[in-house]
């Protein structure tokens, strides 16, 4: 009986079983950072949309290292993060079996893009969501009931979370249904958290009020789907020798005669990608401001630095491929993140206390690349391209027709 001569570690991790399609499209926060009442009241998570990647040049600030004070080129991901709108407050009580919801209070006015989340087919529906609930805020009995609810939450709740949704109308996506999630409020006492959340009902919360420059965060999302794949692609098992009968990209032995079934740990073909994953320790290189109007002019230069003073936006020439233009606030993260373009990502504050030097390093960007990401881009701005290419034939024809 033939057998392999040497043992080897198994291919692929069993820690992520079952490898099947995620049941949810938006990344779920399974645990929030530990609360610290000595800190000011703040949110612990935010939603963003993956736009694409580019690269930056920066000077390393790591005394004692060989690369200290030297320039490095690093890949970065741009995540568009328009302000989120707070539309509800949820109070939780601690029980022997974990957290249980105590009371949920929604705002008086809720936008249609948020209401769409409560319907499967908005077009055919009667669009009656929250019509009865909003009357609570208008009559005297309802107002008294809401006050009683707020006071009971202050008395009994240990954890306060807000319900916030994204603003799809600000994004270059076709989707109209907003993404909705609960975000835990940390810092201060329960009464301070509740007052903070109540003040911000129906208000927008920008990303720079949640995260800061050079902060380490976690990214939660669903990976890019690959469909049904064979065992070699899915588990990275070794290909069999060339002369193998009935295929090479297979597992030769899937188990013993008895027990007369295939063990769960044996690599098999099946779904690859579209899995729910959490990546920790992604460093924020820049929190950029969206387009704004100042003195009647549209200000776009959110990609210029102290070393590169050219007037350019974060968008590469032609926009981000398969996404479009980033016109809102954005977060620049080091390296890559899960998911395809347009994928909704959950950004969460780190659960760990960061002490490593790389985590605490100050980032000073020298240059942000804005060349076209479709082909081999050469030009940083449209003006630079025009100066190099000279007058074009189409411009001359348009000028002649105008004359």
Swiss-Prot record:
Bias kind Basic residues: ranges: 18-31
Modified residues (Tele-methylhistidine): 245
Taxonomic superkingdom: Eukaryota
Record note on modification: Constitutively monomethylated at His-245 by METTL18. Methylation at His-245 regulates translation elongation by slowing ribosome traversal on tyrosine codons: slower elongation provides enough time for proper folding of synthesized proteins and prevents cellular aggregation of tyrosine-rich proteins It is not required for incorporation of RPL3 into ribosomes.
Sequence segments annotated as region (Disordered): 1-38
Phosphoserine, modified sites: 13, 304
Keyword terms: Acetylation, Cytoplasm, Isopeptide bond, Methylation, Nucleus, Phosphoprotein, Ribonucleoprotein, Ribosomal protein, Ubl conjugation
TM region(s), chain numbering: none
Residues joined by cross-link Glycyl lysine isopeptide (Lys-Gly) (interchain with G-Cter in SUMO2): 39, 224, 226, 286, 366, 386, 393, 399
GO biological process, one term: cellular response to interleukin-4
UniProt crosslink position (Glycyl lysine isopeptide (Lys-Gly) (interchain with G-Cter in SUMO1)): 294
Gene3D superfamilies: 3.30.1430.10, Ribosomal protein L3, domain 3, Translation factors
Classification via Pfam families: Ribosomal_L3
One cellular-component annotation, GO: nucleolus
An annotated Gene Ontology molecular function: structural constituent of ribosome
Subcellular location: Nucleus, Nucleolus; Cytoplasm
Modified residues (N6-acetyllysine): 136, 286, 294, 366, 373
Record function comment: Component of the large ribosomal subunit. The ribosome is a large ribonucleoprotein complex responsible for the synthesis of proteins in the cell.
Family under the similarity heading: Belongs to the universal ribosomal protein uL3 family.
Protein name per its UniProtKB record: Large ribosomal subunit protein uL3
């Amino acid at each position: 009986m033939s057998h392999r001569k040497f043992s080897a570690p198994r291919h692929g991790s069993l820690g992520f079983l079952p490898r099947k399609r995620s049941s949810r499209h938006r990344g779920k926060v399974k645990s929030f950072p530990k609360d610290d009442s000595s800190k000011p009241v703040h949110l612990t998570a935010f939603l963003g949309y993956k736009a694409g990647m580019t690269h930056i040049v920066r000077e390393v600030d790591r005394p004692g290292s060989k690369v200290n004070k030297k320039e490095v080129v690093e890949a970065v991901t741009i995540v568009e993060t328009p302000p989120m709108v707070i539309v509800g407050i949820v109070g939780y009580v601690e029980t022997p079996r974990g957290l249980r919801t105590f009371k949920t209070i929604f705002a008086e006015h809720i936008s249609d893009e948020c209401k769409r989340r409560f319907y499967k087919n908005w077009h055919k529906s009667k669009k009656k969501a929250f019509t009865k609930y909003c009357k609570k805020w208008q009559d005297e009995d309802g107002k008294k009931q809401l006050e009683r609810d707020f006071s009971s939450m202050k008395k009994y709740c240990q954890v306060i979370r807000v319900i916030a949704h994204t603003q799809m109308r600000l994004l270059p996506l076709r989707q109209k249904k907003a993404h909705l999630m609960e975000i835990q409020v940390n810092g201060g006492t329960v009464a301070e958290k509740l007052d903070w959340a109540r003040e911000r009902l129906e208000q927008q919360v920008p990303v720079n009020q949640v995260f800061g420059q050079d902060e380490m965060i976690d990214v939660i999302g669903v990976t890019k789907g690959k469909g049904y794949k064979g065992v070699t692609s899915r588990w990275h098992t070794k290909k069999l020798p060339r002369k193998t009968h009935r295929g090479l990209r297979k597992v030769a032995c899937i188990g013993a005669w008895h027990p007369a079934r295939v063990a769960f740990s044996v690599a098999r073909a099946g779904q690859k990608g579209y899995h729910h994953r959490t990546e920790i320790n992604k460093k924020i290189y820049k929190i950029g401001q969206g387009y704004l109007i100042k003195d009647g002019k549209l200000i776009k230069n959110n990609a210029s630095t102290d070393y590169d003073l050219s007037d350019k936006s974060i968008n590469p020439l032609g926009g981000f491929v398969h996404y479009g233009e980033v016109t809102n606030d954005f977060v620049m993260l080091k390296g890559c993140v899960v998911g395809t373009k347009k994928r909704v990502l959950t950004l969460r504050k780190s659960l760990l206390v960061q002490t490593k030097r790389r985590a605490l390093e100050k980032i000073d960007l020298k240059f942000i690349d804005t060349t076209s990401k479709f082909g081999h881009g050469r030009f940083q701005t449209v003006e630079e391209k025009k100066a190099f290419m000279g007058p074009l034939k189409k411009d001359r024809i348009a000028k002649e027709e105008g004359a």
